[in-house]
Amino acid sequence: MPALLTCTDGSAYAPSLYQHTAWAAARMGGSVEVLHVYPAAPPFFIPPVNFMGDPSMGSASLALPELTAVSEAQEREAKLAAETLLQEAATRLAAAGVAHPVLTALPGTLPQVLEAWEKPFDLLLLGKRGDSTAAQRQALGSQLETIIRQSSRPVLVVSHDFKPIERFLISFDDSPSAHAALRQVVEGPLLRGLPCGVMMAGDPTGENRETLDSACTYLKTGGFDAAEFLMQGDPETVSTWEIEAHHFDLLVMGAYSHSRFLQFFIGSTTTEMIRTCRIPVLVMGGQMPHLHPGG
C-alpha cells in the first residue's frame, strides 16, 4: 500500500494540508502518517569543576540539577503541545475521510528528522510556510528548499486554501528530470484520469514543437488528455499566465534540472515560484520509484 507522510507544525496552512492529504490518500489508496517535529531541548553548559578545592565546585553542582529540571520541563511542554497538535490533525483528517492516521512527534528539525527517516513513503506533503514564517507575507518556509533538495520522493507543497484538483500543468524542458516527472505521472495513481497541460517556455521552433509533441504523445498513450502550450517569454511569466488562463489546480515539475526553466524552481532561485504560486506544487524527485496503486 502506498504511504503518505504529512509534515505539520499547526500553521495557518494546516487545514489545507490535511485536506490535500485526504485528497492524495484517496487518489493513491494509501495510508497516512502525520509527523510533527518539535524543537529539541537546548543543550546547557556545564562549567568546568576544579576538584582541587575550588569553591566554584559547589555552585556548579547546584546549577546542574536546576538546568536539568528546566530542560526536562521544556521537553514535557513541547511533547504536550505536539500531542495536542497531532490530535487536532487526526480530527481534521477523520472529517476529511482519513481514518486512523499514524501520529508521530520527534525532536529536532524537520530536515534532520526526514534525512534520518527509515520508514518508506511515497509522497511527502507539507505547507508552503511554517508557523515561524506565518507573519511574513509571502515568506517561504525556511526549511522547505532544504527538504525538497534532499528528498528522493515527490514533495507536494500545498497552497493556503484547498481546492479540488481537477486539472494540472506540467512544466517541461526536455531535461532528464522533466522526463522522470512525465514517467511518474503516467505510472502513478495520484493524477491518473485528470486532464493536463504540458508547457514549454521557448521559441516556436520546429525542434521545440517536436519535443513538446513527443511529451504530450507519451501522456496520451498513458491515458491522459494532454494539451500543448509553447510560449515565448520568461518561464516564470509564462507559467503564471498559463495557470491563470487555463484554470490549472496543480503545477508539476521535475527537480534538480540545470536548465534555465527549472532553475527558476529548484536552484539559486528555488523559492520564487513556489513563493508566488497560488496553487499546490508537486516536485518530483529524480530517484523516486513510481507509485504503485494498492501495493
Which residues does each predicted region cover?
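Aromatic/hydrophobic pocket-lining residues that form π-stacking "cages" and hydrophobic walls in ligand
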Residues: 21, 89, 114, 185, ...
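Gly/Ser-rich helix-loop-strand patches that form or flank binding pockets
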Residues: 13-27, 103-162, 242-295
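A short helix-to-beta-strand connector/capping loop
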Residues: 94-102, 220-227
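Small/aliphatic-rich secondary-structure junction motif
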Residues: 1-68, 150, 163-230, 248
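A structural preference for short, hydrophobic beta-strand core positions in alpha/beta folds
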Residues: 34, 102-105, 157, 198, ...
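Alpha-helix-centered segments that form part of catalytic cores
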Residues: 67-91, 101
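A short, acidic, amphipathic alpha-helical segment used as a generic capping/interface helix at domain edges
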Residues: 216, 234-244
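Conserved active-site histidine-acidic residue motif and adjacent donor-binding/catalytic loop
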Residues: 108-111, 231-237
